[in-house]
UniProtKB/Swiss-Prot annotation:
<protein>
    <recommendedName>
        <fullName>Ribosomal RNA small subunit methyltransferase H</fullName>
        <ecNumber>2.1.1.199</ecNumber>
    </recommendedName>
</protein>
<dbReference type="InterPro" id="IPR023397">
    <property type="entry name" value="SAM-dep_MeTrfase_MraW_recog"/>
</dbReference>
<dbReference type="GO" id="GO:0071424">
    <property type="term" value="F:rRNA (cytosine-N4-)-methyltransferase activity"/>
</dbReference>
<feature type="binding site">
    <location>
        <position position="80"/>
    </location>
    <ligand>
        <name>S-adenosyl-L-methionine</name>
    </ligand>
</feature>
<dbReference type="Pfam" id="PF01795">
    <property type="entry name" value="Methyltransf_5"/>
</dbReference>
<comment type="similarity">
    <text>Belongs to the methyltransferase superfamily. RsmH family.</text>
</comment>
<keyword id="KW-0489">Methyltransferase</keyword>
<dbReference type="GO" id="GO:0070475">
    <property type="term" value="P:rRNA base methylation"/>
</dbReference>
<keyword id="KW-0698">rRNA processing</keyword>
<comment type="function">
    <text>Specifically methylates the N4 position of cytidine in position 1402 (C1402) of 16S rRNA.</text>
</comment>
<keyword id="KW-0963">Cytoplasm</keyword>
<dbReference type="InterPro" id="IPR029063">
    <property type="entry name" value="SAM-dependent_MTases_sf"/>
</dbReference>
<dbReference type="InterPro" id="IPR002903">
    <property type="entry name" value="RsmH"/>
</dbReference>
<feature type="binding site">
    <location>
        <position position="102"/>
    </location>
    <ligand>
        <name>S-adenosyl-L-methionine</name>
    </ligand>
</feature>
<dbReference type="GO" id="GO:0005737">
    <property type="term" value="C:cytoplasm"/>
</dbReference>
<feature type="binding site">
    <location>
        <begin position="35"/>
        <end position="37"/>
    </location>
    <ligand>
        <name>S-adenosyl-L-methionine</name>
    </ligand>
</feature>
<keyword id="KW-0949">S-adenosyl-L-methionine</keyword>
Length: 313
């Protein structure tokens, strides 16, 4: 792998440690990326263990060839939202000992201008995690209604100036279509008055478009529900989020399945019956990166790790 696009896995020890790996366990790395977490899992697995990695980025599939000679490893080209389907095809539902998810965009994707994820590097306005299929960011911006753009910017980017930015994009695109990341970033920088300190004005809009183009939050919802289906009793869920939208979904999911079903007050029901509706147990509190890790890898700053265990009921 090129050093230019090298990737440092965030919260590596904590995330893999949270899986509580067994020698002969079966694990899923739902976001293979460049293999940092997978490598750590394989180092802890015994010879009878198994790791199933998933990624929809063709470059990640290419990077997975580094483990081609390891019989314990296999890679699946697809989105992690479909992990339950892949596990079912393998006949392993209820036998998975741990699921790891490292959400968001990877450093190699950000650093490669040709992928179109970064407003700091000029490149084609693409933003697809799987650049072999689907609509690009440029294609969406060329056709989207003002209301649709404003909704995406507000909902997925928490952008305060969503409507104003959407109107300006619509006004400009008829004269000059937005085909490059620099075109879009420069427009947003030019029209944004109240700029946030230490944050590029295009940050929230780029995040919003990326999330929308790749259906990222839907993928997370599907992956969490799928993980609950495939995990064995005492199986672990270890998830890294990078912004509040992701972490909110993960936190609420763990809380909902840790508390069990809500029961109307006064209904004659035993504690044992309530316990049987609980499917997860949160393991500790949310874990943040240390100051030392942030110093080594600035992109770790916003990361949050949450770990949960499948209950045996």
């Amino acid at each position: 792998m090129s050093q230019e696009f090298a990737h440092l896995s965030v919260l590596l020890e904590e995330t893999v440690g949270g899986l509580n790996i067994k020698d002969d366990g079966i694990y899923i790395d739902g976001t293979f990326g460049r293999g940092g977490h997978s490598r750590q899992v394989l180092q802890r697995l015994g010879e009878n263990g198994r790791l199933i990695a998933i990624d929809r980025d063709p470059q990640a599939i290419e990077a997975a060839k580094q483990f081609a000679d390891d019989p314990r490893f296999q890679i699946v080209h697809g989105g992690f939202g479909q992990l339950a389907d892949y596990v079912e095809e393998l006949g392993l539902v209820g036998k998975i000992d741990g699921v790891l998810l490292d959400l968001g965009v990877s450093s190699p994707q950000l650093d490669d201008a040709e992928r179109g994820f970064s407003f700091l590097r000029d490149g084609p306005l693409d933003m697809r995690m799987d650049n072999s299929q689907g609509e690009t960011a440029a294609q969406w911006l060329a056709r989207a209604e003002i209301e649709d753009m404003a909704w995406v910017f507000k909902t997925y980017g928490e952008e305060k100036n969503a409507r104003h930015i959407a109107r300006c994009i619509a006004a400009d695109r008829d004269k000059t279509p937005f085909l490059r990341t620099k075109d879009l970033a420069d427009l947003i920088a030019r029209i944004t008055k109240n700029k946030e300190r230490n944050k590029h004005p295009a940050t929230r809009v780029f995040q919003a478009i990326r999330i929308y183009i790749n259906s990222e939050l839907d993928q997370i919802d599907q992956a969490l529900e799928g993980a609950l289906t495939v995990l064995a009793p005492q199986g672990r869920l270890s998830i890294i989020s990078f912004h509040s939208l992701e972490d909110r979904i993960v936190k609420r999911f763990i809380r909902r399945h840790s508390q069990g079903e809500s029961v109307p007050h006064g209904l004659p029901i035993t504690e044992d019956q309530i316990n049987k509706s609980r499917k997860l147990r949160a393991i500790g509190k949310a874990i943040m990166p240390s100051d030392e890790e942030i110093e080594r890898n600035a992109r770790a700053r916003s990361s949050v790790l949450r770990i949960a265990e499948r209950l045996d009921y």
